[in-house]
């Protein structure tokens, strides 16, 4: 039986998911509704025509009883403004902007609503892997978890933290560290760049204790993430050197593919 899906957001990520569903790359899925904004109405109409689905610019008008799963692809604020409401009504939701869950109040609300409504919350692994090992090690006890992210300067331009601090990423001759702090602060400072920090922290020891370092490196052509963890079960390190997403230079190609993987996993009867 086909899974009826709605997508909130028709930017780079929403467009990618829409086209993947149309091409049959996400499993047995029917796209029921696309939700966009007035600013993106032309693109919204084009995508809806491609997918032969309904569209709206008002998230509150979604025919929720006809949808099995709602995918967020509209940013952290959309998680707070709309996805919690869908979850409260018992709908399964997928959150791509995982950085929103680094805020303790938001994460606790998601847990509360999920338990009450029965709605499942799906979090794609994004541009990293090894989260299964981190989850397992956390049960035994983790002392430290660290994420070191290095990206080409262009991938970090426009981030709120870069603008706020007046960091000049033009014509860099050498790698510079532009952020060091915990995953909670990283998710707020780089909402479009560092969802992996939130995902890692939720799998492990929490946003406040997960340490994050972000560097801009002019010699890189790939987005690089290195995870280091230490605990009662041992020491672990993972390194990912990801090609940039063709759809979004601020993200990795692996990140968008992880969404398709999560959609397929949701439809499976045998789970890894």
Sequence positions of predicted segments:
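Extreme N-terminal starter segment of soluble prokaryotic enzymes
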Residues: 1-6
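Active-site-lining helix/loop region of Rossmann-like oxidoreductase modules
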Residues: 8, 16, 121-122, 128-272
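Hydrophobic/small residue at the entry helix of a nucleotide-binding pocket
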Residues: 13
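NAD(P)-binding Rossmann-fold cofactor-contacting core
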Residues: 26-47
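A short helix->loop->beta-strand "cap" motif at the edges of active sites that frequently abuts
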Residues: 53, 89-92, 116-119
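General beta-strand structural signal in soluble alpha/beta enzymes
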Residues: 56, 72, 95, 121-125, ...
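Beta-loop-alpha module in the N-terminal Rossmann-like domain of NAD(P)-dependent dehydrogenases
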Residues: 57-88, 100-104
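Rossmann-fold NAD(P)-binding glycine/threonine-rich loop
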Residues: 98-119
